[in-house]
Structures are given as C-alpha cells and as structure tokens.
C-alpha cells in the first residue's frame, strides 16, 4: 500500500534483486542480496535463507503466510470471458457486497453486482445512518436543556418536533450516501444489475429474464429483522426498525421489545422527543453483550433521562384495541402504549439462495476463515454468515472474500478486535473481551479504570459522566479488552482496536503521549491505572 525506504543493516553493494516492483512477496521471502563488490550469487541461493527464516518464525509460534502451491487464478492463463461472464458476481449491495465488488475490480477483475433494492444495505438505508441522524437531534435537544446554565439565554425554551422535516432530512442523507456508493461502483467499472438474484449451483445468477455467470460468487445478501411468534405480533401498530424511521407522527407512548443496540438507540431518540418509552428486555440487563459494569451504568443514566427499563421479563401476548396496544408480560404485568417497536435482533437474509443447498449453522451460512462456503468458489461475507453483524466487520469480510476470489484462498478474516459501539448519550463502545469473559478465559486479570468526572475536556463540555475500563492479562500486561461509556466513546474505541490488533502491552502503550485537553487522555489514564500508575486517580489499595 505504500513505498518506504529500508535501511540496510549491512554495508556492501547490491549484488542481485530477486523480486521485482509490483510483485506480491510472502513474509520472509528474500528480495535481494548485498555483499562484497565482485561477489557472485548462485541462482539457487534464494530458498535456503527464506526456509531458515520461516522455520525460526514458526518455531516461535508465529504464522507465516505460504505462497500458493498452484498458480493463483490471477496469474495463470485464463480463457477469455464472454459478455455475460465475470470473474466475480456479487449478490447484494450492502457493506460486504459493494466493498467486495470494488476490491475485486481494484485487483483487475471483471465484476458484476446484483442488488434488489437500494445500495448500502440495512446500515445505510434502515440502520446505522438513519438512526444517527435522529440521535443527533436527541443530542441537540440535550444541549438546549443545559444552555441556560452555560450563559446562553434562549428567547424561549419551547420547541416542537416536526417529524415531516425530520424524516425528509434523514431521507436526504440516505439518498446522498446511496448515490455515492453507486458512483464508486461505476467509477471502478463494476457492472450493476437491479433485481433479485437467483443463484444456482453452477455459479449462474438469474435476474428476471437475464442470466449471468461468475467464476466466483460472493453472497452478500445481508440480514433482516428477527420476529417472534406471539399472539398479536402482526398488529399494524407493532413496528420494526424498517418502518419506525419513516414514522411521521409521534406517538404519545412507545413500548420497545428488546433492549439491544437498536432498541436502546431508538428508544432514546423517541424519549428525547417527549414520548413515554418503556423498554422490555429478557436478559438481566440492557445490551447484555457489553461489559456488565458498562451496561448497568448506561441503564442508570438512561433511567435518569426518563426511559423506563424492565429487565428479566418478556412479552407473551399483544392485544390491540382503541388505537393502542396492551403488552402482556410473562411476569403478569401489562404495558399500555400507542405503538410498539420489535427489536430483538436480526437473522440472515437467504432469499434467492434456496437452490444452493449450502451448509448452514442455525440459519446462518457456514463459512471458513477465508469466507468461503461449503461450495468452493462461493463466498459469503457479512451479516449473512452471522459472525459479526456490524457494517465495518462486513467491510473487512467483503474485502477478504474478494481477494480470495481473485487470488485463491490467501487471506483470512481476523475479526477478534472488531470494535462495537452504541450511539446513546453518553456513547458506549467496546473492543475485545469483557471482564467476565477475560476472567473465565485467563483467570487472573488486571483492571484499570478512569472516570470522565476528572477529565478537563469532559467537565468543560458538560459531559463528565462515564468511564474507560481496561482489562489486561496479569502476567504480561497484554490488553484483553477495552470498554468505554462516555463522550466520543465510538471514536475513542478505535485507538483500542489499533493497539490490540498490533499486540501492544500496557507498558508499551504508556510510552505514548496523549494530547491535552482531550477525551482520549482518559484512555491513557485507564491504561496507567492497570499498573496503579494513573496520576489523576486516587492511589490503588495495596
């Protein structure tokens, strides 16, 4: 991806170059020889040093990528492609799909992409982006509440929510970004087909009356809203994230079934608009995949914002009457609301893939570490494999699938340090293991924490709530997990992901300098607290 100068550790003259510019070179491969002037390098001298270096690395427990034993599809002679044939046919234009299509084209492939609806997938059209436009509104409303205390005297504290303008603005944002995705595809000469693609075992894809063929197929059909089978669930007053974002009239009350990321984010939006919101979650806390301490802190903050949160309880029946709903809970209680939001998660979207007879795991397409399915040459990155239902994870899986489709299975998808965030106020983010999981796996761990209550930037911004929590291995100080609740958590967590991906220890991280005044100083303080060295924290008890 870059050109850089490398300083030779030995002096001498360049005797021989064994690899040329533009070649892909495996780790430990010899690329040239330095020696005394006039010295001769034998033609077969490239293999021994490389083999010795490889053996040393493998003995140390490190994985060394191997050059493919057979010529890759990108380098061997190929028959010419017919007009309706492609190196890669991508089915689905969401994050995994469009990313894979563009990456395949960058690698010199002839690529087609099939999309039945709008490009950008759930994230862009009905998920990440639309919810962030609404959550920004909630943030602005929070700002109005503290304006007077900061010396900003508003002529009136009264405001109204114009849902028509809210929805129209959201739609304009979505339109801008979906158009951008199509622009990138066209710029990379990816052929676009609109319609539902029916994929066949012979790697043909039928779109309406047209059939195209791929040497490789990438299935990126994404996911859909998960539903529950209880009486009354089909009421028109029960919405999902697919339709609540187009609601142009605010209900007086909203019952949210599911306290995961989507339910909590949308619940907060409507609570900030003045709607009476009740969240019902079957687990013992909201967003149960998050670190328990962080989850409980968020629950406490949201309760103070007016959201009613009920945990360890489920909905057994919904009764509609008098333009409202009665949700009957399995503990005998009832909730009455004008509308309900079903947000219990998502499941893979398999429409158009019925003919393939792929191996599935609980309804998810089973893939190997190369993103390849049970059928060689057919890959399935993103939500459809259920590994990590996050857009940024889908980007990586799509990228890996495209590279493997073009070059043979040469790259694995490493997703252990994929960050995740909840865009509430305050934000929540995590990367790596929770404290509970780390203790179960490693036994003795160290915990470092630093509160935003002592962070100068947070205090000045009226955002002095929450904390950063670091989980580290007690022996080597390896960073096992980072968890944040507080301002800019979704931005700060990317520092943690980079640190962990590059295997920096706490001791090594503390060699860095963080700017002041910044929210990210709290990251440094939490890392220092792992070792009991945080200057702005009270001394740890011995």
Tell me the role of every PLM-derived stretch:
Residues 89-91, 197-198, 212-222, 256-257, ...:
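Short hydrophobic core segments
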Residues 36-85:
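Intrinsically disordered, low-complexity linker and terminal tail regions
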Residues 1-44:
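Small cofactor-carrier domains centered on a conserved lysine used for covalent cofactor attachment
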Residues 79-96, 250-262:
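Beta1/beta-strand and adjacent pyrophosphate-binding region of the FAD-binding site
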Residues 91-93, 105-117, 129, 133-140, ...:
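Flexible, glycine-rich terminal cap/loop adjacent to redox cofactors
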Residues 231-251, 334-407:
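FAD-site-proximal beta/loop scaffold in flavoenzymes
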Residues 87-113, 262-272:
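N-terminal Rossmann-like FAD-binding beta1-loop-alpha1 element of flavoenzymes
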Residues 71-77, 84-85, 102-109, 114-250, ...:
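Glycine-rich flavin
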């Amino acid at each position: 991806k870059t050109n850089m100068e490398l300083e030779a550790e030995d002096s001498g003259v360049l005797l021989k170059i064994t690899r040329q510019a533009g070649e892909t070179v495996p780790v430990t491969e010899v690329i040239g020889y330095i020696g005394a002037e006039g010295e001769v390098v034998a033609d077969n001298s490239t293999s021994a040093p490389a083999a010795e270096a490889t053996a040393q690395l493998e003995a140390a427990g490190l994985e060394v990528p191997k050059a493919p034993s057979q010529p890759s599809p990108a380098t061997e002679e190929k028959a010419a492609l017919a007009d309706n044939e492609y190196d890669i046919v991508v089915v689905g234009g969401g994050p995994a799909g469009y990313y894979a299509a563009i990456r395949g084209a960058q690698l010199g492939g002839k690529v087609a992409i099939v999309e039945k609806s709008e490009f950008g997938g759930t994230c862009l059209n009905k998920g990440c982006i639309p919810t962030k436009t609404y959550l920004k509104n909630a943030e602005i409303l929070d700002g109005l509440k503290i304006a007077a205390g900061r010396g900003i005297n508003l002529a009136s504290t009264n405001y109204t929510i114009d849902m028509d303008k809210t929805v129209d603005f959201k739609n304009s944002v979505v339109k801008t970004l979906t158009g951008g995705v199509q622009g990138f595809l066209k710029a990379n000469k990816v052929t676009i087909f609109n319609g539902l693609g029916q994929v066949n075992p012979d790697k043909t894809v039928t779109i309406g009356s047209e059939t195209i063929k791929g040497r490789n197929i990438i299935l990126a059909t994404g996911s859909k809203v998960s539903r529950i089978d209880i009486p009354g669930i089909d009421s028109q007053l029960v919405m999902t994230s697919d339709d609540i974002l187009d609601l142009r009239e605010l209900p007086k009350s909203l019952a949210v079934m599911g306290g995961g990321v989507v339910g909590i984010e949308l619940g907060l939006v409507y609570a900030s608009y003045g709607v009476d919101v009740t969240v019902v979650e079957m687990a013992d806390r909201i967003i149960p995949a998050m670190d328990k301490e962080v989850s409980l802190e968020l629950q406490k903050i949201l309760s103070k914002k007016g959201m009613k949160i009920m945990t360890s309880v489920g909905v057994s029946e919904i009764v509609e009457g008098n333009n409202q709903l009665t949700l009957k809970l399995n503990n005998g209680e009832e909730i009455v609301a004008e509308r309900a939001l079903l947000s219990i998660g998502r499941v893979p979207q398999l429409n158009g893939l019925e003919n393939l007879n792929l191996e599935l795991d609980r309804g998810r397409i089973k893939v190997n570490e190369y993103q390849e399915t049970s059928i060689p040459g057919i890959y399935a990155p993103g939500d459809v494999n259920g590994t990590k239902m996050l857009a940024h994870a889908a980007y990586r899986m799509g990228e890996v699938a495209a590279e493997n489709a073009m070059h043979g299975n040469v790259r694995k998808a490493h997703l252990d340090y994929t960050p995740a965030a909840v865009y509430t106020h305050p934000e929540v983010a995590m990367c790596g293991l929770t404290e509970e999981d780390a203790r179960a796996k490693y036994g003795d761990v160290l915990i470092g924490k630093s509160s935003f209550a002592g962070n100068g930037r947070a205090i000045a911004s009226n955002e002095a709530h929450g904390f950063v929590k670091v989980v580290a291995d007690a022996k080597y100080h390896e960073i096992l997990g980072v968890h944040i609740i507080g301002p800019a958590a979704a931005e700060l967590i990317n520092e943690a992901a980079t640190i962990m991906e590059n295997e920096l220890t706490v001791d090594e991280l503390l060699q860095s300098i963080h700017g002041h005044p910044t929210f990210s100083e709290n990251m440094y303080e939490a890392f220092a607290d792992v070792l009991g060295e945080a200057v702005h924290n009270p001394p740890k008890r011995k």
